[in-house]
Amino acid sequence: MKKLCFTSFDHGITHFDLANNYGPEPGSAEKHFGLILKEHFFAYRNELLISTKAGYDIWKGPYGNWGSRKYLIASLDQSLQRLGLDYVDISSFHAEKKSLPSYLSIGRAFFVCSCIINVQDLRIYTP
């Protein structure tokens, strides 16, 4: 993965797209990219566009997937931890929940994950 990141960056690719469930083990792509970023690319952080997604299963339990407020906030918190960052440039909703009207999924994902504010500030949000 390190060689791929270096080659990409050397050829002008600055958008790195991840998700909470990518990797052979959920979260491992973010974890590995976070280590590479910390060790080799942190000086270039302002040149990078880092995105992550949430939506599919990541942990067991009633809030381990889909678009609940609890899931989206927890997932973004965990992605930031794995990446070693305090913000990502883009965070989006990765899955569709058939029982949830699409306008609610889109609205929640947009509000909860696309705002450029501290994740802790989102805890006051009630849909």
Per-region residue spans from a language model:
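N-terminal binding-site loop/beta-alpha segment at the start of enzyme catalytic domains
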Residues: 1-49, 86, 115
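Solvent-exposed, flexible loop/coil residues
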Residues: 26, 53, 104
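Hydrophobic/aromatic residues located in beta-strands of well-ordered beta-sheets
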Residues: 47-50, 120-122
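Beta-hairpin (beta-strand-turn-beta-strand) motif
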Residues: 21, 53-55, 96
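Glycine/proline-rich, positively charged
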Residues: 57-127
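Extended hydrophobic secondary-structure segments that form protein cores and membrane-embedded regions
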Residues: 49-53, 92
